[in-house]
Amino acid sequence: MPEQPLPTLPMWRVDHIEPSPTMLALRANGPIHNVRFPRGHEGWWVTGYDEAKAVLSDAAFRPAGMPPAAFTPDCVILGSPGWLVSHEGGEHARLRTIVAPAFSDRRVKLLAQQVEAIAAQLFETLAAQPQPADLRRHLSFPLPAMVISALMGVLYEDHAFFAGLSDEVMTHQHESGPRSASRLAWEELRAYIRGKMRDKRQDPGDNLLTDLLAAVDRGEATEEEAIGLAAGMLVAGHESTVAQIEFGLLAMLRHPQQRERLVGNPSLVDKAVEEILRMYPPGAGWDGIMRYPRTDVTIAGVHIPAESKVLVGLPATSFDPRHFEDPEIFDIGRDAKPHLAFSYGPHYCIGMALARLELKVVFGSIFQRFPALRLAVAPEELKLRKEIITGGFEEFPVLW
């Protein structure tokens, strides 16, 4: 009997956001699977919730930004000073501790009114456009950039500039060569941040750049590490939230009964955001976080050779019935159980409180401001950004 070919990634979502039937079928057969990656490498895909947590918290695995030599891509951001996923252990903890105060509950609460004001401003900008209008251009793309401007302590007017650079870095991150679009954008972004940090010497404040300067002055980080930390927070904090707003809106438009529940009971917004994060997180078809075991390991009875590719399929874990009851049902009243949309372990998303705030502000008010909000095209006509791991859309045309 001929050997069956390995399941191959990516496994594209149905209608851009619904889980892949192939992924669901694989997940039903166990928590870990031998798969083939897009460039032909064999590896492993972890789809079980408990198994994913175990891998993500186990120091026996290298983080995504520290791959073995056989898998090192020509990626401009990997290995860059201050890029958190390219550090582990004590070095990672040192760098993460420096930026943690900027994302503390206290700092995020202080930003709440600003986020609400930014969203209200963008709603009015959208409302002033001729219909149909591109919601991506007027809301989902600028909002996270304007929020990160406030967090970093730079001018709102700069948001379009650095959001564009962030987009270039992520869209072209695997292009090679010293003059690649990604490398040029990354260098320009770092130069921009370097200049803004100089400005903060004369005009400090309660913001991330001032925190980073203080860390440099205390000898806790080099200037290049501080610049890299700021650039990393900007890139990571922008692209994923853009996609999450778009996927969440598409989810609510696809589930009108859930939308009506939210409109009728705005107090459900916290649960609605968690359900959107659980079932419709950012991503396209190869969703997850890579890990590399340093030695041979066994996961759920499966032997994994050292230095193999192990993709922790974060979205797939949300459909594990051992953890979530009726996981394929979108229910904004679901009793909350922890999901892995923000990862787990030492490298969990440091900006998750800020991301949650942005999503709660958007989903807590957009359907009040635009009661008849709807897509201007059929969902299948939306163009998914397949070249970027977070997904999202080229445009998001809407009517209201």
UniProtKB/Swiss-Prot annotation:
Kindly report, in one word, the top-level EC class recorded for this enzyme: oxidoreductase
Keyword Transcription regulation appears in the UniProt entry: no
Q: Cofactor(s) for this protein?
A: heme
A GO MF annotation of the entry reads:
monooxygenase activity
Task: Give the Enzyme Commission number.
Answer: 1.14.14.-
Which positions bind heme? C349
Does the keyword field hold Iron?
Answer: yes
Task: Quote the InterPro entries the UniProt record gives.
Answer: Cyt_P450, Cyt_P450_B, Cyt_P450_CS, Cyt_P450_sf
What does the UniProt keyword field contain?
Answer: Heme, Iron, Metal-binding, Monooxygenase, Oxidoreductase, Plasmid
The record's listing under Gene3D superfamilies reads: Cytochrome P450
What family is it from? Answer: Belongs to the cytochrome P450 family.
Role, per record: Cytochromes P450 are a group of heme-thiolate monooxygenases. They oxidize a variety of structurally unrelated compounds, including steroids, fatty acids, and xenobiotics.
The name of this protein is Cytochrome P450 BJ-1 homolog
Originating organism: Sinorhizobium fredii (strain NBRC 101917 / NGR234)
